[in-house]
Regions:
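Transmembrane beta-strands of outer-membrane beta-barrel pores
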Residues: 162, 181-187, 200-202, 211-215, ...
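Periplasmic-side early beta-strands and strand-to-turn transitions of outer-membrane beta-barrels
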Residues: 166, 173-180, 184, 188-291, ...
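Gram-negative outer-membrane beta-barrel transporters
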Residues: 360, 435-436, 440-442, 555-559, ...
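Acidic, small-polar-rich N-terminal luminal/periplasmic segments of exported/outer-membrane proteins
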Residues: 32-168, 539
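Outer membrane beta-barrel strand-and-loop segments of large Gram-negative receptors
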Residues: 349-359, 524-530, 536, 543-614, ...
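C-terminal beta-signal and adjacent terminal beta-strands/loops
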Residues: 503, 554-561, 565-567, 663, ...
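Structural signature of Gram-negative outer-membrane beta-barrels, strongest in the C-terminal barrel
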Residues: 370, 378, 415-558, 608, ...
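Flexible loop and strand-edge segments within Gram-negative outer membrane beta-barrel domains
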Residues: 234-236, 254-311, 325-350, 518
């Protein structure tokens, strides 16, 4: 840990340590005072089989989401979860414990979201296809909990729960709702949303709709115009829509049957002025790109809470669902020098399918040991499709010469991979054993995952410029055990240790993508990839309650068979059936080449005082190394610390938050080594007594207008120089205001 990291570490630890001696003064606090990731050891019962029932999970409520004005994953990591990050650079991905993309999982309403990635055309994203306005809670599960997360959760999971009718219908009422609106100067955006729920006897329904419209994300650049010297952001505008419908039927025997339907759409257009020049291939006003994220989901839901403790099953949940996700990157241009004329592209990658997941808990006793046995399963049958449509002035067939020389590598109106029919199936079992009154709990668990990918030749794929054969199928399986030990020293202090293995199967894109042509370059999939696996250890403690508490976790994880892209040697090309004499500039394919390790520490603490003041602090530090090259992993973010001080009454509150991040290590594989920074945010909220249910939130972010860079957003860019680096900077001072009315 370098000097900058040590300073940040010591400052945050000092704040955490300072909370402890002050605890004696805390008695009777405002009931709605908030804190950074409050740790509650005793409270509402969580089903043993629930994905968040682990000491490695932290919980954020709807109230905290609203008060902290959390509207994105980045907001969550900035104000509440220092170990959660979002990479907007090339991956458009959630990042937990230094892993991102398809190595972390996102689950909403019990349904996993797919991270869509076209490895040939740099299209990626999809796991962020949700709206925070629709959420009732956010849980972050750290590490590979093999008993619940399963395929793709090597780094952890973001578990999202959407509003239920009961969240809006107050006690003694048969209907309720909320409306919200707000403005953010960071991207000149405003949003509006409304949700209403109604109950008739044992039947309840909820409908929610929200809309957001904005422009480009601000930065600290001040050079406008066109070309590579521009540091102001490219002009952009976006629209976001979200719809949610739920129908629930309660029974008097503890069963709840439901129907859920969701529709999410995000669409953005950007004027690429940095790529335009008066005499260049792209002229001013004639070069833009687009981005589209879509997600549709319909599910039948089932919940069960046993009305008494003498039944065989204590609790159960199940979801039968259909889901479709689409990611599209597009280009709308006129070219002037190379391939002159209209140039349009629509690059799509889509996955749709049917799935089922569920579990049940069964409690019983043997001797002096209390057991809660959980059985569960996850099944998903899907089809992945990729297609690139386009319009350009390229001749219908080669040879391509003169201004059309680039046409040899401008492949369009083709599929870069076959349609892929996939099946994923898993079963898991765990037994939470409590040994009398000793406070000791032991939870062994075992999960079995199986996958099968079967490519289907289509006319669009057979028309690929490489004229490929249909590749072979790919299948595999894995056993992932877990052992969790917990020792409750008191009602408010628990020690824990966990060993768990994790698993990620190769994606259809990694297996079967083919893009290129002789004389240019070739990117090709690898149908013989092995799954990635992890072997991790966590030890730590959780203590306290909502008034004074915290957590401390140390973790170490080894990863095997990491999938990375690598250029093939001539001998390797021959072994793959590729002719090196075809004149490829390079041949790149994903291979299982590396082992890696990531270790670190996570801390959180909070304290609330009887005079209305509160303090909180958090820290996330991780270090990751590619053991094949001894180079630091670029996907592992630098140390981040958060220190906050606030004051609250029953009607209003104010918070001052400092976020400090160290600079990227010189040994990192990151192309750009982002320097460290420290920024302040000032936020507040007010609930006027005259208007019941109204809450107004406001905040000033980056209070002192610092210029800083996000390490994950910039790690893959090789063109950053001292002259243009402000184009890649984060927003300066911005403000945000929002209003929520419950009725």
């Amino acid at each position: 840990m370098n000097i900058r990291a040590t300073r940040c570490f010591l400052l945050t630890c000092t704040a955490i340590a300072a909370l402890s001696p002050l605890s004696a003064a805390a008695q009777g606090l405002p009931p709605d005072a908030t804190a950074l990731q409050t740790i509650v050891l005793k409270g509402k019962r969580v089903k043993a089989g629930d994905i968040v029932n682990t000491p490695l999970a932290s919980h954020t409520t709807e109230e905290e989401i609203e008060k902290k004005q959390v509207q994105s994953i980045e907001d969550l990591g900035r104000s509440l979860e220092p170990g959660v990050n979002y990479s907007r650079g090339t991956t458009n991905s959630l990042n937990i414990r230094g892993l991102e993309g398809n190595r972390v999982a996102t689950v909403i309403g019990g349904v996993p979201l797919t991270y869509l990635q076209d490895t040939a055309r740099s299209t990626a994203g999809g796991a962020e296809s949700f709206d925070f306005f629709a959420l009732t809670s956010v849980d972050v599960v750290r590490g590979a909990d093999s008993s619940r997360i399963g395929d793709g959760g090597l780094g952890g999971a973001l578990v999202l729960r959407t509003l239920e009718p009961e969240d809006l219908i107050g006690e003694g009422r048969d209907w309720g709702g909320k409306v919200g609106t707000g403005y953010d100067s960071m991207d000149n955006s405003w949003y509006g949303g409304a949700a209403v729920a109604k109950r008739v006897e044992n039947t309840s329904a909820l409908f929610l709709g929200s809309y957001k419209k904005g422009d480009e994300r601000d930065n600290k650049g001040d050079v406008g115009g066109y070309g590579a010297t521009r540091t102001e952001p490219n002009p952009a505008d976006y629209d976001q829509h979200n719809l949610l419908f739920k129908l629930r039927q309660d029974t008097e025997l503890g069963h709840v049957f439901g129907l859920t339907a969701e529709r999410f759409r995000f669409e953005k257009d950007t004027d690429l002025r940095r790529d335009q020049m008066l005499t260049g291939n792209y002229r001013p006003g004639s070069h833009s790109n687009g981005q589209l994220n879509e997600r549709d989901r319909v599910s039948l839901d089932y919940f069960y809470e046993a009305p008494s403790s003498d039944g065989l099953v204590d609790a159960a949940e199940a979801t039968l669902y259909w889901q479709r996700q689409l990611r599209q990157d597009s280009q709308d241009s006129i070219r002037w020098a190379s391939v002159p004329g209209v140039y349009k592209r629509w690059n799509d990658i889509e996955e749709s399918g049917f799935g089922f997941n569920g579990f049940f808990d069964s409690g019983f006793e043997t001797g002096g040991v209390s057991h809660v046995l959980t059985f569960g399963t996850d099944i998903f049958i899907s089809r992945a499709e990729q297609y690139s449509a386009g319009v350009d002035s390229c001749p219908a067939s080669p040879p391509y010469t003169g201004v059309y020389g680039a046409c040899g590598n401008l492949h369009t109106n083709q599929a870069d991979m076959p349609d892929v029919d996939s099946k994923r199936m898993s079963f898991y079992v765990q037994d939470r054993m409590s040994f009398g009154d000793s406070g000791f709990t032991l939870t062994p668990a075992l999960r079995y995952d199986w996958f099968d990918h079967h490519p289907q030749a289509t006319a669009a794929y057979l028309g690929n410029a490489m004229k490929p054969d249909t590749p072979p199928g790919s299948s595999g399986d894995a056993w992932s055990p877990k052992l969790l030990a917990e020792y409750e020293l008191s009602d408010t202090f628990t020690l824990f240790g966990q060993w768990a293995m994790g698993f990620r199967s190769p994606t259809a894109s990694e297996l079967y993508m083919t893009f290129g042509a002789p004389g240019t370059y070739l990117r090709t999939g690898n149908p013989y990839l092995e799954p990635e696996t992890s072997n991790g250890f966590d030890v730590g403690a959780r203590f306290g309650d909502s008034d004074f508490g915290g957590s401390l976790t140390f973790f170490y994880t080894r990863y095997k068979n990491f999938i990375e892209n690598r250029n093939l040697t001539a001998a390797e090309q021959i072994a793959r059936g590729i002719d090196p004499s075809a004149g490829y500039m390079f041949v790149q394919t994903p291979v299982n080449v590396s082992r890696a390790e990531i270790y670190g520490i996570e801390l959180a603490a909070h304290k609330r005082f009887d005079n209305g003041f509160n303090m909180r602090a958090g820290l996330a530090y991780a270090r990751g190394t590619n053991l094949g090259t001894d180079q630091l992993l670029a996907s592992v973010p630098p140390l981040k610390g958060i220190i906050g001080v606030g004051y609250e009454t029953e009607a209003w509150g104010v918070d001052l938050l400092w976020t400090g991040v160290e600079g990227v290590d010189d040994q990192s594989a990151a192309s750009f080594k982002a320097p460290g920074y420290g920024i302040f945010d000032l936020t507040g909220w007010w609930e006027p007594e005259q208007v019941k249910g109204l809450r107004i939130q406001a905040g000033v972010y980056n209070l002192f207008d610092r210029t800083y860079y996000d390490a994950l957003n910039t790690k893959d860019y090789t063109t950053i120089t001292a002259a243009n680096e402000e184009y890649y900077s984060e927003p300066g001072r911005t403000f945000r205001i929002s209003l929520t009315q419950r009725f």
